[in-house]
Amino acid sequence: MTLDTAEKQKLIESHQVHATDTGSVEVQVAMLSERISKLSDHLQGNIHDYASRQGLLKMIGKRKRLLSYIKGKNPQNYQDLIKKIGIRG
């Protein structure tokens, strides 16, 4: 499941670090989280879509690696990001 341009722009604006930021780790995690959410909804109704399930697992793994990177570099940013996105309780 892809995000349209307006959704991407909204995510970038809400998570960017500076005015021209489009690829920081925070923005990447926010976009991945949104795509994971959309794909999870898709898989609720299409339980035999194994290719999408595989893509979902890859996205979850990538998000996990990016989050561990943030946690190592700046634990406060990590805490702020997971609260802002609403993952991990």
Curated annotation (Swiss-Prot):
What the entry lists under PROSITE patterns is as follows: RIBOSOMAL_S15
Which keywords belong to this entry?
Answer: Ribonucleoprotein, Ribosomal protein, RNA-binding, rRNA-binding
**Example GO BP:** translation
Q: Which InterPro entries match?
A: Ribosomal_uS15 (IPR000589), Ribosomal_uS15_bac-type (IPR005290), uS15_NS1_RNA-bd_sf (IPR009068)
Q: Does the keyword S-adenosyl-L-methionine apply?
A: no
Origin superkingdom: Bacteria
Transmembrane regions: none
Q: Does the keyword Nucleotidyltransferase apply?
A: no
Q: Which GO terms describe its molecular function?
A: rRNA binding; structural constituent of ribosome
Which Pfam families does this entry report, sorted A to Z? Ribosomal_S15
Which SMART domains does the UniProt entry name for this protein?
A: Ribosomal_S15
Cellular component aspect of the GO annotation: cytosolic small ribosomal subunit
Write down the HAMAP family for this protein, in alphabetical order: Ribosomal_uS15_B (MF_01343_B)
Question: What does the UniProt record say this protein does?
Answer: One of the primary rRNA binding proteins, it binds directly to 16S rRNA where it helps nucleate assembly of the platform of the 30S subunit by binding and bridging several RNA helices of the 16S rRNA. Forms an intersubunit bridge (bridge B4) with the 23S rRNA of the 50S subunit in the ribosome.
Family of this protein = Belongs to the universal ribosomal protein uS15 family.
Database matches in NCBIfam families: S15_bact (TIGR00952)
Quaternary arrangement and interactors, per the entry? Part of the 30S ribosomal subunit. Forms a bridge to the 50S subunit in the 70S ribosome, contacting the 23S rRNA.
Task: Specify the protein name.
Answer: Small ribosomal subunit protein uS15
The gene coding this protein: rpsO
